[in-house]
């Protein structure tokens, strides 16, 4: 008699995805971040659900409802901080996951990669709208500045911004719709994750060498289930240390001041995980140019499969490309730092140089490095 997990229509799907899935025997810990993102998503949906039970999306009560959650709701403080810092962990895992894909050439799985880019945009939109909900100073001004960028679109810009705001400024209508979208988007993300996995399981996982591992597969369970559980435990440990010892480390003190349209904070900046894109936006003096650079800084990922010139898939045996990859990582860290600094010398120049370097590395230097490496190997 066939095992029920192999015959039952529902269990069969679970079995083929998480138990009997053939996986390469040599995938390293960099492959853990996909499952960690799943853990983050589930945790964010659960903590978010409990927060939504007590939150009110009204400009007069939003700020005090968050304070009420922290003070009066049973374990409300830990739910709130798990949700806020969980977003930071989500983005750390996301960026490492994308970086892993870049380093090991996983972007040659085109469908999986493109769904991943859509996922990245959706998660960024969700996080942005979530940041607006506590209705602190940075929530309000962040929402005003970022939505206002759409006014740079020729002809329809101003109308579009007012349509998104639901009025002539960021107000009650904006907060209510942001809450509605912030609630629904994680479920859309979950559906996209299923599509992402569907495409991945059509081809099977990549591995550090970048060559086919068809002749050397092992079952996902117990080998990678145990490995993923260890990763998840480490993630939860780091998150709990952050939440229990310094929950406000990654936040902005300005967000503990209720939103005031009459008082602009001295430095308007988004959460730390958007600072690299914010730095690219600010490095261009023209509004429309800045907005285009901002969008392209993420959308450029879609061009990477077309810019792959090397005859090897992975960077594992390509030292020049490896050097450029780590320069790119350092450049993104520099941009993150610049995004949090005021717009004054020398930060303006550093931001502009780092922005030019970012696009140059991806569009010119890395493809050229691939060609040079082919020549060195006489391919």
Swiss-Prot record:
State its role.
Component of the ubiquinol-cytochrome c reductase complex (complex III or cytochrome b-c1 complex) that is part of the mitochondrial respiratory chain. The b-c1 complex mediates electron transfer from ubiquinol to cytochrome c. Contributes to the generation of a proton gradient across the mitochondrial membrane that is then used for ATP synthesis.
Q: Its GO CC terms?
A: mitochondrial inner membrane; respiratory chain complex III
How and how many cofactors are bound, per the record note? Binds 2 heme b groups non-covalently.
Annotated gene: MT-CYB
Q: Say if the entry is tagged with keyword Metal-binding.
A: yes
Known partners and oligomeric status: The cytochrome bc1 complex contains 11 subunits: 3 respiratory subunits (MT-CYB, CYC1 and UQCRFS1), 2 core proteins (UQCRC1 and UQCRC2) and 6 low-molecular weight proteins (UQCRH/QCR6, UQCRB/QCR7, UQCRQ/QCR8, UQCR10/QCR9, UQCR11/QCR10 and a cleavage product of UQCRFS1). This cytochrome bc1 complex then forms a dimer.
Q: Look up and give the membrane topology term.
A: Multi-pass membrane protein
InterPro entries assigned: Cyt_b/b6_C, Cyt_b/b6_C_sf, Cyt_b/b6_N, Cytb/b6-like_sf, Cytochrome_b, Cytochrome_b_C_euk/bac, Cytochrome_b_N_euk/bac, Di-haem_cyt_TM
List keywords of the entry alphabetically: Electron transport, Heme, Iron, Membrane, Metal-binding, Mitochondrion, Mitochondrion inner membrane, Respiratory chain, Transmembrane, Transmembrane helix, Transport, Ubiquinone
A GO molecular function held by the record: ubiquinol-cytochrome-c reductase activity
Record-given protein name: Cytochrome b
A Pfam family in this protein?
Cytochrome_B
Residues annotated as binding heme b b562: 83, 182
Compartments where located: Mitochondrion inner membrane
Q: What else is known?
A: Heme 1 (or BL or b562) is low-potential and absorbs at about 562 nm, and heme 2 (or BH or b566) is high-potential and absorbs at about 566 nm.
Q: Where does heme b b566 bind?
A: 97, 196
Any transmembrane segments, and where? 33-53, 77-98, 113-133, 178-198, 226-246, 288-308, 320-340, 347-367
* Cofactor list: heme b
| Binding-site residues, a ubiquinone | 201
User: In its UniProt record, which GO terms are filed under biological process?
Assistant: mitochondrial electron transport, ubiquinol to cytochrome c
Against CDD domains, the record matches this protein to: cytochrome_b_C (cd00290), Cytochrome_b_N (cd00284)
Family, per entry: Belongs to the cytochrome b family.
């Amino acid at each position: 008699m066939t095992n029920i997990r192999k015959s039952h229509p529902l269990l069969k799907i679970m079995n083929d995805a998480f138990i009997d899935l053939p996986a390469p025997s040599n995938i390293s810990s960099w492959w853990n971040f996909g499952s960690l993102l799943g853990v983050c998503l589930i945790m964010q949906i659960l903590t978010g659900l409990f927060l939504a039970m007590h939150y009110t999306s009204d400009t007069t009560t939003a700020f005090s409802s968050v304070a009420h959650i922290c003070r009066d709701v049973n374990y409300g403080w830990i739910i709130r901080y798990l949700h806020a810092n969980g977003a930071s962990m989500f983005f750390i895992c996301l960026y490492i996951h994308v970086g892993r894909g870049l380093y090991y050439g996983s972007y040659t799985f085109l469908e999986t990669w493109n769904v991943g880019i859509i996922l990245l945009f959706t998660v960024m939109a969700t996080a942005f709208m979530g940041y607006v909900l506590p209705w602190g100073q940075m929530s309000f001004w962040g929402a005003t500045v970022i939505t206002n960028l759409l006014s740079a679109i020729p002809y329809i810009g101003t109308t579009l911004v007012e349509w998104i705001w639901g009025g002539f400024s960021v107000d009650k209508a904006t907060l209510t719709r942001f809450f509605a979208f912030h609630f629904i988007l994680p479920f859309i993300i979950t559906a996209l994750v299923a599509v992402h996995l569907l495409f991945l399981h059509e081809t099977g996982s990549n591995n550090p060498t970048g060559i086919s591992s068809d002749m050397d597969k092992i079952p996902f369970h117990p080998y990678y289930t145990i490995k993923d559980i260890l990763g998840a435990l480490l993630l939860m440990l780091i998150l709990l240390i952050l939440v229990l010892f310094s929950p406000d480390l990654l936040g902005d003190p300005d967000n503990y001041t209720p939103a005031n349209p009459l008082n602009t904070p001295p430095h308007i900046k988004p959460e730390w995980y958007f600072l690299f894109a914010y730095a690219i936006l600010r490095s261009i003096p023209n509004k429309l140019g800045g907005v285009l650079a901002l969008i392209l800084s993420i959308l450029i990922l879609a061009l990477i499969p077309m810019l792959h010139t090397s005859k090897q898939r992975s960077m594992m045996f390509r030292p020049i490309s490896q050097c450029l990859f780590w320069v790119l990582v350092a450049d993104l860290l520099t941009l993150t730092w610049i995004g949090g600094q005021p717009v004054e010398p020398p930060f303006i120049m550093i931001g502009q140089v780092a922005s030019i370097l970012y696009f140059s590395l991806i569009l010119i230097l890395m493809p050229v490095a691939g060609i040079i490496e082919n020549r060195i190997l006489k391919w």
